[in-house]
């Protein structure tokens, strides 16, 4: 089962938290569509900043949007002008009071979504898919990843018949629920058609905090 399902969704509520944190009774559908619109808008507008994920929190008529970015300087802009413009656009889109929070991604090489997008960009620039995969795997392992697997599917190298090729290093235990595995997907639009890129990165195990037994007598 771990081989088939999205590793992020499988671990939500176990070692991962939700990316949308709010509760809705009757207007769930509208808020869900609003979330999708906000995420799509932010990803498109801040393409150069490297945005792997957008977290959304809601309370009454307020929305808090946390944008994770590899290049936070591009998001903030000179003197915070860009982030203020973004906030106003999001307020106009949602009709609610919006607070924007920027979080820096310290190691982009260990973020599966950014890695997948990087490989897709290289494929669009006609870099050999084997070379792109191999170099990316080496970079991730150098940055402290414990395992990585990259899969490319489509008309690789302009071949007549589409196929899937993958490259991996280290270990990626997809069945282990306490394993911190990040997953990312991106598409490369080449002259021969789309090439799908999937990336799994294993960062180590997340062990539950041990409960310290309280000693009687205040010791």
Swiss-Prot record:
<dbReference type="GO" id="GO:0003735">
    <property type="term" value="F:structural constituent of ribosome"/>
</dbReference>
<dbReference type="Pfam" id="PF00189">
    <property type="entry name" value="Ribosomal_S3_C"/>
</dbReference>
<protein>
    <recommendedName>
        <fullName>Small ribosomal subunit protein uS3</fullName>
    </recommendedName>
</protein>
<dbReference type="InterPro" id="IPR015946">
    <property type="entry name" value="KH_dom-like_a/b"/>
</dbReference>
<dbReference type="InterPro" id="IPR004044">
    <property type="entry name" value="KH_dom_type_2"/>
</dbReference>
<feature type="domain" description="KH type-2">
    <location>
        <begin position="38"/>
        <end position="106"/>
    </location>
</feature>
<dbReference type="Pfam" id="PF07650">
    <property type="entry name" value="KH_2"/>
</dbReference>
<dbReference type="GO" id="GO:0022627">
    <property type="term" value="C:cytosolic small ribosomal subunit"/>
</dbReference>
<keyword id="KW-0694">RNA-binding</keyword>
<dbReference type="InterPro" id="IPR004087">
    <property type="entry name" value="KH_dom"/>
</dbReference>
<dbReference type="GO" id="GO:0019843">
    <property type="term" value="F:rRNA binding"/>
</dbReference>
<keyword id="KW-0687">Ribonucleoprotein</keyword>
<keyword id="KW-0689">Ribosomal protein</keyword>
<dbReference type="GO" id="GO:0006412">
    <property type="term" value="P:translation"/>
</dbReference>
<comment type="function">
    <text>Binds the lower part of the 30S subunit head. Binds mRNA in the 70S ribosome, positioning it for translation.</text>
</comment>
<dbReference type="InterPro" id="IPR005704">
    <property type="entry name" value="Ribosomal_uS3_bac-typ"/>
</dbReference>
<comment type="similarity">
    <text>Belongs to the universal ribosomal protein uS3 family.</text>
</comment>
<comment type="subunit">
    <text>Part of the 30S ribosomal subunit. Forms a tight complex with proteins S10 and S14.</text>
</comment>
<dbReference type="InterPro" id="IPR018280">
    <property type="entry name" value="Ribosomal_uS3_CS"/>
</dbReference>
<dbReference type="InterPro" id="IPR036419">
    <property type="entry name" value="Ribosomal_S3_C_sf"/>
</dbReference>
<keyword id="KW-0699">rRNA-binding</keyword>
<dbReference type="InterPro" id="IPR001351">
    <property type="entry name" value="Ribosomal_uS3_C"/>
</dbReference>
<dbReference type="InterPro" id="IPR009019">
    <property type="entry name" value="KH_sf_prok-type"/>
</dbReference>
<dbReference type="GO" id="GO:0003729">
    <property type="term" value="F:mRNA binding"/>
</dbReference>
């Amino acid at each position: 089962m771990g081989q088939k399902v999205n590793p992020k969704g499988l671990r939500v509520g176990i070692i991962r938290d939700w990316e949308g944190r709010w509760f809705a009774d009757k207007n769930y559908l509208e808020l869900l569509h609003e979330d999708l619109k906000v995420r799509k808008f932010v990803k498109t507008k801040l393409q150069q900043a490297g945005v792997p994920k957008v977290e959304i929190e809601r309370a009454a008529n307020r929305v808090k949007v946390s944008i994770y970015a590899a290049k936070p300087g591009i998001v903030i802009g000179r003197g915070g002008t860009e982030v203020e413009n973004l906030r106003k656009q999001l307020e106009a889109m949602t009709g609610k009071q919006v607070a924007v929070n920027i979080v820096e991604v310290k190691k982009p090489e260990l973020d599966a979504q950014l890695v997948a997008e990087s490989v897709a960009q290289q494929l669009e620039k006609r870099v050999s898919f084997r070379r792109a995969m191999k170099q990316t795997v080496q970079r991730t392992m150098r940055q402290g990843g414990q395992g990585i697997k990259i899969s490319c599917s489509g008309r690789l190298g302009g071949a007549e018949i589409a196929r899937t090729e993958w490259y991996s290093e280290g270990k990626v235990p997809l069945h282990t629920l306490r394993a911190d595995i990040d997953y990312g997907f991106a598409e490369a639009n080449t002259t021969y058609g789309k090439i799908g890129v999937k990336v799994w990165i294993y960062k180590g195990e997340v062990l539950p905090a041990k409960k310290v037994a309280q000693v009687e007598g205040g010791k």
